[in-house]
């Protein structure tokens, strides 16, 4: 699963997922899966969607992942009293805004790209739309 090799600090503030999207253009491929909602994608969700997409295209084309989970999410263990500091890092997330490109694909037909992105988007917690050049 995706996660940073090293970070300056182990834990991060919760923060807010606001603002406008930065990478809303297709850079590498010819088709793209674009987010419609605002949310957080876990690294395991990103990986399972990638697997579904690559299996659907039967390794014909090329797939690019345009998001990276760089925000640590902490959790305290079950049945632990409040206080005693912040919990341990449980998983990593990527913050997603509307219009953000999640995956790109090239080397396949439009129908196959639509089918593959439909299978991949079912693994993600945000609504998505397929776009092309």
Curated annotation (Swiss-Prot):
One GO process term, biological-process aspect: translation
PROSITE patterns: RIBOSOMAL_L16_1, RIBOSOMAL_L16_2
Keywords assigned: Ribonucleoprotein, Ribosomal protein, RNA-binding, rRNA-binding, tRNA-binding
Pfam family, one: Ribosomal_L16
Superkingdom of source: Bacteria
GO MF, one example: tRNA binding
InterPro entries, per the entry: Ribosomal_uL16, Ribosomal_uL16_bact-type, Ribosomal_uL16_CS, Ribosomal_uL16_dom, Ribosomal_uL16_sf
Entry annotated with the keyword Ribosomal protein: yes
Gene Ontology cellular component annotations, sorted alphabetically: cytosolic large ribosomal subunit
Family classification: Belongs to the universal ribosomal protein uL16 family.
Functional summary from the UniProt entry: Binds 23S rRNA and is also seen to make contacts with the A and possibly P site tRNAs.
Subunit structure: Part of the 50S ribosomal subunit.
Name the UniProt record assigns to this protein: Large ribosomal subunit protein uL16
Species classification: Bacteria, Pseudomonadati, Pseudomonadota, Gammaproteobacteria, Enterobacterales
